Amino acid sequence: MKLEQVPTPAYVIDLAKLEANCRILQYVQEEAGCKVLLAQKAYSLYKTYPLISQYLSGTTASGLYEAKLAREEFPGEVHVFAPAFKDEDMEELLGITDHIVFNSERQLRKHGSRCREAGVSVGLRLNPQCSTQGDHALYDPCAPGSRFGVTIDKIPSDLLDLVDGLHFHTLCEQGADDLQTTLKAVEEQFGPYLHEVKWLNMGGGHHITREGYDVDLLISEIKRIRKTYNLEIYIEPGEAIALNAGYLATEVLDIVENGMEILVLDASATCHMPDVFEMPYRPPLRNGFESQEKAHTYRLSSNTCLTGDVIGDYSFENPVQIGDRLYFQDMAIYSFVKNNTFNGIGLPSLYLMDEQGDCSLLKAFGYQDFKGRLS
């Protein structure tokens, strides 16, 4: 079965592109002498973990469930960070994780000693108060009032007695130049501590596999930090692992005319690609162009009752007909990890596409998946 034959709606993962991304990340690991971890919050299709784990050193989790999934399905290190931990979750985490990073001094003092007794390496998240995000203020952990990380004025005096390593995460879909800027701020504020700890985790948001990313600068900065402070370095990209490695296949169910032609699809921004609203952004579409760029412009909408469930305006070289198929691109990341069944809309099936373009069904969803979440 080829992509054009897959029943819609469906997420289709391009295994060749996924592996190509992983090879780039493996190159960074080897050249920089660091460890690259998969941030599961962006991509957690665990049936592909055997492939990814051939290239990466482990995973990072945002809580108990992701940590359990990693320990069960992904060979390698398991790291965990959360703004706060429940006592019952911590009890289970101690048996399955290698690193736990705390967000505050209070959380560190509450759980840190238990972690060390269990053989878990302990870290503290820093807030270098260095904002480098121009278009993603919603995702800026260094924004005023952010709940993430400890600022330099809140560092506990006995920090080095409490932690093995330090962590920061300030980037979102950014380049190595922004990491370089952030590292300068981290060194200026926290440099004395870096000389004393064992490891530094530089977090995620590194768009390493994006075309034009300065991989050489990333490698040189990691090498510099390693040499200067004698540290083990971790980075934990999410999007970079599966960037441009997935499609959302959809069908045109109807065309409504109201000042313009509106396509009603069997895919939904609200249900199937919520980042359209949360970033917000306009997802790339195969053979689709900017509004008015080509001869035929349409508004792409969804089959829900939410008026604002609109994906965006696109133009096409040829008219679109009812029954035509459209393919949204870069749909492996922050898609099925965030989707939902609002309005009783079904979840898209999951397919894997091999190097020959043949697609195989991984999982199909139905009514019981909708009903099973309710009672």
Set out the residue ranges of the language-model regions:
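Charged helix-capping and loop-helix junction motifs
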Residues: 180-185, 214-220, 250, 315
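Charged (often Lys/Glu-rich) extended helix/loop segments that serve as interaction or gating elements
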Residues: 221, 235-375
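Feature marks short, surface-exposed loop/turn motifs that line or immediately flank catalytic pockets
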Residues: 130-132, 172, 208, 241, ...
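Glycine-rich beta-strand-to-loop/alpha-helix junction loops that act as flexible
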Residues: 39, 170-171, 200-209, 237-239
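Active-site-proximal beta-alpha core segment in soluble small-molecule metabolic enzymes
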Residues: 34-199, 221
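N-terminal capping/small domains of soluble enzymes
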Residues: 2-75, 81-84, 268, 316-329, ...
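Acidic/histidine-enriched ion/cofactor-binding microenvironments in catalytic or ligand-binding pockets
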Residues: 188, 194-197, 217-228, 314-327
